Amino acid sequence: FAPRLLHQAIDLYRNLYRPSAAWPKPYLAIGVPLIAAPTDEEAEFLASSTYQRVLGILTGDRRLLLPPVENYAARLQPQERAAIGDFLAAAVIGGPETVQAGLADLVRETGANELMLVSDVYDPALRLRSLEIAAQAHAALQAAVPA
């Protein structure tokens, strides 16, 4: 998990990698913040919990995950929105199609072998649904890859 320095961390890892018998090539696993919902709009609403958490991390006001807030991003100062966006640069937030495209783009951009997803959704049932949508997106991506 190196959200703001993801590409630099990947370059450093690959440049300093030393092959071994067990791992002749680098194996890249990256952490990805993910919020998935049936629609992009609902995912953005649910992501407001993550935005609140990130802002708390950045300002030293750490708390337990808070419930989502309607139009949370609109209430923020431009520099707060920018800081949250920077922190979550590798995040994938959206409905099924957006998530599928976002995961595919992230793998293409990074060459990741594995994605470790974290879904900070306040409601546990909706968190599970978020991960189920991500699993469906992954399955669709795998089905599209030629054997």
Predicted feature descriptions by range:
Residues 1-147:
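Active-site-adjacent structural elements that line small-molecule/cofactor binding pockets in enzymes
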